[in-house]
Regions:
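Short coil/turn connectors at secondary-structure junctions
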Residues: 9, 36-37, 87-88
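Conserved P-loop NTPase motor cores
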Residues: 12-30, 75-165
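Short glycine-rich substrate-engagement loop in P-loop NTPases that contacts/grips substrate
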Residues: 59-83
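Structural motif
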Residues: 17, 44, 64-66, 152
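Phosphate-binding and hydrolysis-coupling loops of NTP-dependent motor/remodeling domains
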Residues: 163-201
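Pre-Walker A adenine-sensing motif
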Residues: 1-7
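Walker A/P-loop NTP-binding active-site region of P-loop NTPases
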Residues: 17-59
């Protein structure tokens, strides 16, 4: 099985159902990124300390209140502060759909869209995790370089994901397998974590 390497400064979307192992997979993606780039985790569920505790060079973005973490205002402030202090970093956003849902309700624009656009020209990488792929706006999806898709069975999500990957393949995946789709090369691979490495099946 071939060990999969991931280039730095890319935008990666992890699409998988609840309890499929997105955070587990994200940790191994971070390990696969070469160099010593600082990684900042934004987690509205306050689980970043648990999910990424053993990793070096990984820092959680915190608020005192969980409700505040789900607001676009706090997220935007955190990102602007981060950009002012760091020129080269990776940002991991757990359950980004929660932020997107709140931004739709409040009609507040999320700084993530500008960050995703700017990342092409700056040394910024993004890994976002979601269990609601059909809720990801086109302006974020269009800037995503690499997609990792877990098993989905819901027609709404399959219709959305079917534009990238064959729906039949998605339905046959078994936890914790993912389909890796590279938008730049149009290469599609089935991957999983084995012996602490991401490998092609």
């Amino acid at each position: 099985m071939e060990n999969i390497q991931i280039d730095t400064n890319r935008i990666i979307g992890l699409y998988a159902p609840q309890n499929y192992g997105k955070s587990y997979f994200a940790r191994h993606i971070i390990n696969a990124i070469s160099g010593h780039i600082p990684v900042f985790v934004y987690d509205t569920n306050f689980e970043a300390d648990t999910n990424y505790a053993s990793m070096k060079n990984v820092f959680a973005i915190h608020s005192v209140k969980k409700s505040e973490m789900e607001t676009p205002a706090f997220f935007n402030k955190a990102i602007l502060t981060l950009r002012a202090k760091q020129s080269n970093f990776y940002l991991v956003i757990e359950d980004i759909d929660k932020l997107i849902e709140t931004s739709h309700k409040t009609k507040d624009t999320l700084e993530i869209f500008k960050l995703a656009s700017d990342s092409r020209h700056q040394r910024i990488g993004i890994i976002y995790l979601t269990k609601e792929p059909s809720n990801i706006p086109v302006k974020l999806r269009s800037n995503t370089n690499l997609f990792l898709v877990g098993q989905f069975l819901e027609p709404t999500h399959l219709k959305y994901l079917g534009e990238m990957v064959d729906r039949k393949i998605i339905k046959t995946l078994k936890k914790p397998e993912f389909i890796l789709f590279d938008r730049l090369t149009q290469v599609i691979q089935k991957v999983k974590i084995e012996n602490n490495k991401m490998v092609e099946l």
